[in-house]
Structure formats: structure tokens, C-alpha cells
From Swiss-Prot:
Designated gene of the protein: SPMIP4
Protein name: Sperm-associated microtubule inner protein 4
Protein's UniProt keywords contain Cytoplasm: yes
First-listed, main subcellular location of the protein, grouped into a coarse class: cytoplasm
Xref: InterPro entries: SPMIP4
CC per GO annotation: centrosome; cytoplasm; motile cilium
Protein function: Microtubule inner protein (MIP) part of the dynein-decorated doublet microtubules (DMTs) in flagellum axoneme. May serve to reinforce and thus stabilize the microtubule structure in the sperm flagella.
Length: 584
């Protein structure tokens, strides 16, 4: 029984296997028309047919490689009548060729005129390399660029930005060329030479501590390319693990296309680096709001300091604009008229008509000059000493002065009052701009208390509920106890006999008693010092414990015991029984 061959795309060898697999015993039943038709046979029968067939076994893969079994290529004039058998095209070794190096029993014929290639006159064949006995091939030791084995895990750029300029006089390239180096330029570490023989258990290290004049500046390796040396016989060993390279080494270099070296740029970059040292707190809270943009160009000031001989002049960058608090411009008044280049207005007050035709506001007549006042007459009648009369007279003048200041802001005529201020006939509601207190009012020094509301006439009477004896100001929130003028039920009975009855006690209590303080509070240029707030006394008056006690007293609810367990979930007890019994 002859073996039927399959498709001819495989190598021309005897098909079949020594042991047929189980998938080929009944291939027509399981996989019909999918494989080549092949009758099955037993193993012994197959070996008999294989040995009976006499065929020349060729090298494996000869047809599928360069120079394998190909038909003989001959020109048309040399073409034989019958086609010659196939032979090996070329016999010299090629990589991937599965046959023998030098084929035997088959001649090697090469026809160079079939192509444009020309046969070499030096060698006997077309090989460019000489034969091994005549070749002189040697190793070439030349460095080649390499990368560190951990190059993929090394940052390609600088991790932290730098503000140093290559033109800097202290950290730039010019500073690296000077020796000894300034303290602002880092230097390389000391070189270490390790002397150790292979197999020797001891390690000998030689440390070289160079002098300051022989130190080298610190630079990053790998600025251009790393080169490695191959393993040669009589050469140095290669550097297996060089220092980690960086694709962009942060070494500074001067721009050759920019010959102008500007020292201002170096100064600006230095100040820019200093500006990053300012904390966010100092930047946002300066006392006058956030910080304004900084002035980074102070090269002129540093040049002047260098010429004048100042050593170490390197100030911190300052703000371009310093904020200042400017008061608002008044719309009217004395200051507004001065800003508008207008003549300031003078206060015009109506003088009280004199009862004596010979008296003037400044000069009195002869009669009133020598006639004693009512106070002096009362003092003579009561036999009061002269020194007490003098003190009472000073008190009377002081009260008159305060009442005269208060008379500038008199109430309308519908509220007639009986006090010393109504002795002068002044227009009601005078303008503040017509007085000489505009500047004091602008600087918030004229802190006037509102006028007291006196008793009105029966025609203007409005029925109100009876309230406690408090002085009602225009602001209903502020209440105070009655002052000196309201100590008696009727203002008509007010005279100086109350002051003259106890002169010593009145003199001592004028400064200490709160009721005898100036009516207008503090008046500028009135001879009274401005009252100061005692912050320490106010601070000591506060008690944290007392505040907590008042807070706890304000809470009306009962204190909760943290040990009590409050169940905020669903209710499980109904009428004293658990819900389990109701469901079952």
C-alpha cells in the first residue's frame, strides 16, 4: 500500500509519524473533508512501506533558505534539451541555513553575468571577507553612549526650580572659575580610591583631601552623554554603574548668542527668590491690608551702596506702594472752604442788649465798675470769708462758661427752660459750620450729649404714663440718673445759695463726684484733661467663672445625665408587654 502525500507546501520528506496519534485513526468519521485523504495503517505495516521506498533525503529546509534547492539557471543559448535536476544553488554558510556547511557530491556553479554584480578580482569567490587563515581581525576599544540601568526611574528634569542666574557674581559660572571658591559655590566631594585585589578579604580605601586651591566645583554628571568602554584585553575596565544621568542636567551655561551680560537680570532673579521666602501670613496681614507688589529691581541702590563703601547691603524686597489712611474730604465747613480756596466764615453771635446805655460788651461804665456783684453782697451780708468767696466765684465762672458752650445748641422756643443758658438771646439750631468747633467735630473730639427734655407748657402738654425719674435723651436706649440741675423739683429755685451753703464739701467733690463732671463730657481746650479708659481695670472686671455661672443659670432646662440611656429607635414595649407577644 503506497503512502499518499499531502499538500506540497511543506518540505519534501516522507510524510507520516513513527506513532500515529489517536486523532488520525478515524479522521473521516470525525473530521471529514478537513484533512488530506490518507488511509490509516498499523505501525508495523507503515514501517515496512517506509523502508521499501528508496528516496534521497535532502537537508531539512533547503528549499526555504537562501541558497537551497533551486533549478539551474542557464541562459537561453546554453539551455539543454531536457531539464537538468535540481542542485544546491550556493554552498557557503548563511545564518539560518539548516544544511551542512560545505555540501558534498554537488558542484557549486555561480553565474555572475546574470546580474549587475561584478566578480571580484582579488578573491576567488564573491565573499568580501578574506579566508580565516589570511584574516587579521582585532578588537576596537572605543567608548559608546549608554544610560544608567535605573534611568527610567530617575527624574528627567530638576525637581525643584532654581532662581540662580549663570551671570551671578556669587553662584554663577564666573564664581566657579575663581579659586579658592567663595562660600556660595558648592564643591565636589573628596575622591575615594579603592585598592582591593580579587580574592583578598581586606579592603583598602585611599581618601584624597585636596587643598582649597585644588578643589573642583560641583556639577551634575551626564550633561552631554555617558560613554562606556567595552571589555578589552589590554584596556581599562568599563564603568558598569555610572552616576545617575539626567536628561536635562541643571548645569548653568552662558548663552553664546547673547554677549551682553546684564547684572540687572541677576539682581531681579535674586530678589524673586527672596520674595518666595515671605510667608503667606506676612503677605496677607501687614497691618494695612495685604501686601502690594514688590519692587524687584533695586540694582541702582545696591550700586550706590557699593560705591559709598557699605558692606553687605542686601535688603529685603520692599513694596512698590505703601498704603496710607487718608481721611475723607468734608463737603462743607471750614476745611472744605479752605480746600476750595474760599474765605472761611466767622461765627456771628447776637449780643445780649445791655440794660445800661453807657456799658459796652468789653468796657463797663464807671458805675458798674465799682458796684460789687450780687455774690459779693451776699458774702458781706452773711460774713463769709474772702477766700471762700473767691473760690465760689471761680466755681460760678466755670459753670457759666460751660453753660455758654451749651447755649450754642439751644432747644426751640416750644421748650422754655429756666437756666443760665437762656440769659443770651441766640437763634435756635445754629449751623455747626457757623461755629468755631468744626475742626473739633471733624476729629471726633466734640462729643456732645443730647439736650435734656425740660417741662413743657400746658399748651404743649402730651399725656404720657408716669415713668421713673430718668433723663430721656434723643436715644431712648441711653438713660442716666438726674444731674445737679434736676436735684430739685423746680428749676426756678436754682440759685447759688446751694453752692454757698457747703463751700468746702463742694470744692472737694467737684473733681471726684461723677455728677459734678462737665456737662458736655470732655471739651477741647476747656482746661480739663481728656478722660482715659482704664483697659486693665476693664480686663480685670471680667470673670470667666462668673460668665459660666450666668450662662448656666440662663438655661432653664434640667441638666442631662450622660449616664442615662435614651433609646431613639423603634418602640418595643406596648402596655407593659414586649411587641414579641403581639406578633405571635
Amino acid at each position: 500500500m503506497e503512502v499518499i502525500h499531502g499538500q506540497p507546501y511543506c518540505c519534501r520528506e516522507l510524510e507520516g509519524a513513527d506513532i500515529l496519534s489517536d486523532t488520525f485513526y478515524s479522521n473521516e468519521l470525525h473530521t471529514p473533508l478537513e484533512t488530506a485523504t490518507r488511509p490509516t495503517a498499523s505501525e508495523d505495516r507503515y514501517q515496512k512501506f517506509r523502508q521499501s521506498l528508496q528516496r534521497c533525503r535532502l537537508p531539512w529546509g533547503a528549499e526555504r533558505e537562501y541558497g537551497g534547492m533551486i533549478p539551474i539557471s542557464l541562459p537561453e543559448e546554453h539551455r539543454p534539451k531536457c531539464e537538468p535536476p535540481r542542485v544546491m544553488g550556493k554552498g557557503h554558510q548563511h545564518y539560518g541555513f539548516g544544511g551542512e556547511i560545505w555540501p558534498r557530491k554537488l558542484p557549486i556553479e555561480q553565474f555572475y553575468y546574470l546580474s549587475q554584480n561584478k566578480k571580484s578580482d582579488i578573491y576567488g569567490n564573491d565573499s568580501l571577507l578574506p579566508k580565516p587563515p589570511n584574516s587579521t581581525v582585532g578588537e576596537i576599544c572605543s567608548p559608546y553612549p549608554i544610560e544608567h540601568p535605573y534611568h527610567t526611574h530617575i527624574s528627567r528634569g530638576a525637581m525643584f526650580p532654581t532662581f540662580t542666574s549663570p551671570k551671578d557674581l556669587y553662584t554663577g559660572i564666573k564664581a566657579r572659575t575663581q579659586q579658592p571658591f567663595p562660600p556660595t559655590v558648592p564643591t565636589k566631594p573628596y575622591d575615594t580610591t579603592v585598592l582591593k585585589t580579587r580574592g583578598n578579604p581586606y579592603r583598602y580605601e585611599l581618601l584624597d583631601f585636596p587643598m582649597d586651591s585644588k578643589k573642583k566645583a560641583l556639577v551634575w554628571p551626564g550633561q552631554r552623554v555617558y560613554f562606556d568602554l567595552p571589555k578589552c584585553v589590554e584596556k581599562n575596565k568599563p564603568v558598569f554603574y555610572p552616576k545617575p544621568p539626567k536628561t536635562f542636567a541643571p548645569n548653568t551655561s552662558l548663552n553664546s548668542w547673547d554677549p551682553i551680560t546684564s547684572l540687572k537680570e541677576v539682581n531681579i532673579q535674586r530678589n524673586l527668590e527672596k520674595s518666595h521666602w515671605i510667608t503667606s501670613y506676612n503677605h496677607d496681614f501687614t497691618g494695612l491690608g495685604p501686601m502690594n507688589p514688590l519692587e524687584l529691581d533695586d540694582y541702582h541702590e545696591k550700586e550706590v551702596a557699593e560705591l559709598t563703601g557699605q558692606i553687605g547691603f542686601d535688603p529685603e524686597p520692599q513694596e512698590k506702594v505703601h498704603p496710607a489712611l487718608k481721611p475723607t474730604r468734608p463737603l462743607e465747613g471750614r476745611i472744605a472752604r479752605l480746600i476750595q480756596n474760599q474765605r472761611p466764615l466767622e461765627a456771628i453771635l447776637e449780643q445780649r442788649p445791655s440794660s445800661c446805655p453807657d456799658c459796652t460788651p468789653r468796657v463797663l461804665c464807671t458805675f458798674h465798675t465799682f458796684v460789687p456783684s450780687s455774690t459779693e453782697m451776699m458774702a458781706l451780708s452773711d460774713n463769709i470769708p474772702a477766700d471762700v468767696t473767691h473760690k465760689n466765684q471761680e466755681i460760678e465762672e466755670k459753670i457759666k462758661e460751660e453753660q455758654s458752650l451749651l447755649s450754642t445748641y439751644a432747644l426751640p422756643s416750644c421748650y422754655p427752660t429756666k437756666d443760665l443758658a437762656n440769659t443770651y438771646d441766640i437763634k435756635p439750631f445754629p449751623k455747626i459750620t457757623d461755629t468755631k468747633k468744626t475742626e473739633d467735630l471733624y476729629w471726633r473730639q466734640l462729643s456732645l450729649k443730647p439736650q435734656l427734655i425740660p417741662y413743657c407748657n400746658p399748651d404743649h402738654y402730651i399725656p404720657y404714663e408716669h415713668l421713673n425719674q430718668y433723663n430721656v435723651y434723643q436715644n431712648p436706649v441711653s438713660l442716666s440718673k438726674p444731674g445737679i440741675l434736676q436735684s430739685k423739683p423746680d428749676l426756678k429755685t436754682f440759685d447759688f445759695e446751694h453752692f454757698l451753703s457747703k463751700p468746702e464739701q463742694l470744692t472737694l467733690n467737684m473733681e471726684d463726684d461723677e455728677e459734678t463732671k462737665p456737662i458736655l463730657g470732655w471739651i477741647p481746650r476747656a482746661g480739663v484733661a481728656k478722660p482715659q479708659t482704664d483697659l486693665l481695670e476693664l480686663k480685670n472686671a471680667f470673670s470667666k467663672t462668673g460668665a459660666q455661672k450666668r450662662f448656666h443659670k440662663s438655661v432653664l432646662e434640667d441638666y442631662k445625665d450622660l449616664r442615662d440611656k435614651e433609646h431613639l429607635g423603634k418602640k418595643h414595649q406596648f402596655y407593659g408587654h414586649n411587641s414579641y407577644y403581639f406578633y405571635n
